[in-house]
Amino acid sequence: MISLLGKMRKQMNGAVADAMFYYGENYGLNYGVSLPTVREIALTERHDHALAEYLFKQQVRELKLAAFHIADPTLINASNSALWANGITNSELAEEAAFALLRHSPAVMEIVAEWLRSESEWVVYAAMMAAARSNATSTAEIESVVDIVSRYPDSRPIAQGCVAMLAAAYLNVEFQSVVKSTIETLNNCAATDYIREEMSWRMEF
C-alpha cells in the first residue's frame, strides 16, 4: 500500500481536487489525481483481492478508486459484496465500481439484482451502471426502475443510471416493449422527466 500511495502522491494536484465534482459524500483525503492517472497506476499492480479490500477501507480517494482495479472480479459475488457496497458513498465511486469491477464479475447479474434493492442511492446507481455496461439486464431489472424512481424522485444520478440501463436494454429487441411500458408507468417527478426526455430520442433510432 505504501508504494501505491507514494505513486499517487507524486501525481498530487490540488487544483484538480478543488475543481472536482461528484454527487454524494466527500473523501477523507483527496490528492486530486486525475481518474485516468489513478487507473494507469492501479493497472500496473497485479490482482490482489485481499489488498484491494484493505485499500478500499482507507479514507483516501485514490486508494479507494485503485481498489476496484486491483480486486479480482472473479472473487466477488452477491453474498460477499457487502464490503464494496458499504464503501460506495458517492457517484464517482459508484461509476468506477461498475466500470472496473462489477461488469467483469461472472456474478454480475446476481450482484446487480441484490444491489438494486439497496437502501443506498449510490449502490443502486452502481448497480444500474454495471447492468448497462455488461448487458446484465432482464425484465425484472427493467421493471425495477418504477420502484427506484419512486424512491429517488429528485435524484439526477439515479435518473442517469436509469437511462443508462434502459438504453442498454432497448438495444435488445426482446426488451423494447417492456422498456417502453416501464417508462410510461413512471410517476411524474423530476427523475421521470429526465428519463423520458433522454429516452425519447434514443428510442427513435
Located regions from the model:
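Alpha-helical scaffold domains
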Residues: 1-205
